[in-house]
Amino acid sequence: MRVIYRGDLDGIVSAAILMEVGLCDELVQAHPKDMQAGKVDVQEGDIICNLPYHSNCGMWFDHHSSVIDSSAMPEEFTGLVEVAPSAAGLVFKYFLPDHPELSKYEQLVKETDLVDSADLTLDQVKNPEGTFLLGFLTDPRTGMGYQQDLNISNFQWVSSLVELLTKYSVEE
């Protein structure tokens, strides 16, 4: 199954959880504006995380209040959409009851909540470590995307993080 996700920490952690439960065999990064403009090829059954809804999707997870208050909010869908600190937290909440092995992501999800909701201390911003540093590096507005002289593209690096997070902790 394809997972269409935003290439920030929230989207990456959401996709990693979906990969962990066996629902992800292909990753597609997308930007919200491209989703809204219809530029993303959403196929029947795709799982969408942290991005606007598309009628072809099989599951949808989002936490933005603008989506919930929108007329584009579908009446019925599979997944979870509610105002929350992160979409990763919603994916975690949705699958944890049937997949207790996901408990290994609990701390990562809590820290992703803090990063995505910008609920950080001054020290976490000025001296980021662990998940907070990863959040900064993966943020398209502040991170590695601005570096043009790297051996790997930002797109490739972000995509590799999804699988790496299923195998290693952030510190590893």
Explain the meaning of each model-derived region:
Residues L122-E172:
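Acidic catalytic cores of enzymes that act on phosphate-bearing nucleotides/polynucleotides
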